[in-house]
Each structure stands twice: as C-alpha cells, then as structure tokens.
C-alpha cells in the first residue's frame, strides 16, 4: 500500500484494511449509541495487530477515541511499551499500562474487536468486560467466539461476527 501511494497520484484503498476499518468504526458508533456509551470514553481491546487491526485502530483514533483507550493484543500478548520486539507500526499503539495478557486487557473493557483467530475468547474474558459490552468477533471463517456462545455468557452484550449465518453479521 505504501509503495503504491508513492507511485500513484490517485487515492489507494486497501479493502482488507480500510474497508474493515470503516465498517467496524460505523458499527462501533452504532453499538455505543445502543449501549448508552460515549465513544470517546470507552475502553477498547483490539485482538490482532495485522493490517486490518491497525487500520481500525487508526480510524477509531481519527474519530476521537484516544490511543490510551485502545489496548492492542497480538500473538505474544498485549502490545505495551515494555516490549522490545515491536516494529514501528505496533509501537504506534503500545500502551503504557503494565498488562500483558488478553485476560488483563479485557478487564473493564467496554468493547472487544477481534481481528485475529477463531475460538480464543473464553467466558472469563467476556465476564471481565463492563456492563453492556460490545463484542465484535470478526475472525473468519471461525470468530473469536460464536454469536450464540457470547450471548449465552453475556445476554446484555451487543455482538457481531463476520458470519453470514449469525443473526447480527
């Protein structure tokens, strides 16, 4: 993408990155309205640190959600300032909080945005979230947690997946 931007004099849209970011941002704004939460005040855990996750975090930041309210988790744990293995892109979203695990990142989170791998969210992590949590389990083809499982654990949750067979795609 960066190379194309340097070569071309037209806008470049990377669908997997920017398309995902736009849809997630719009859905999150709507979910906040339904849940009675102010977007700029919510704590967000983003699971995944690939291009879609980074673009989503950047989009949310551009919409007024401070980076300090976003905790990003990759396959090695929370992306924080204590880690020495971060590239410049991951460093952009490194939290200063001294937490290391997904479980710790989910403690008190208002929203979970999953852009990682399937079946990684457990009941304890969902239960650690605030009232009326927003859970976007978007890994495909298998979400981080299924719609039905998330709703059975937290009936108060606003849940979306990328699955067309789920009621809230």
Give the label of every model feature segment.
Residues 9-10, 87-93, 156-157:
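Active-site regions of enzymes building and remodeling cell-envelope glycoconjugates
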Residues 17-18, 84, 98, 126, ...:
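Short capping/connector residues at structural and topological boundaries
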């Amino acid at each position: 993408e960066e190379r194309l931007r340097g070569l071309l004099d037209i806008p470049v849209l990377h669908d997997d990155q920017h398309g995902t970011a736009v849809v997630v941002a719009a859905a999150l704004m709507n979910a906040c309205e339904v849940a009675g939460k102010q977007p700029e005040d919510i704590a967000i855990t983003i699971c995944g640190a690939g291009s879609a996750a980074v673009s989503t975090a950047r989009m949310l930041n551009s919409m007024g959600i401070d980076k300090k309210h976003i905790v990003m988790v990759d396959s090695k744990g929370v992306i924080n300032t204590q880690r020495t293995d971060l590239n410049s892109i991951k460093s952009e979203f490194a939290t200063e909080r001294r937490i290391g695990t997904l479980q710790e990142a989910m403690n008190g989170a208002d929203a979970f945005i999953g852009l990682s791998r399937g079946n990684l969210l457990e009941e304890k992590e969902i239960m650690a979230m605030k009232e009326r949590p927003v859970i976007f389990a978007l890994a495909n083809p298998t979400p981080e947690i299924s719609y039905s499982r998330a709703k059975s654990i937290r009936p108060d949750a606003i849940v979306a997946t990328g699955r067309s067979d789920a009621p809230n795609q």
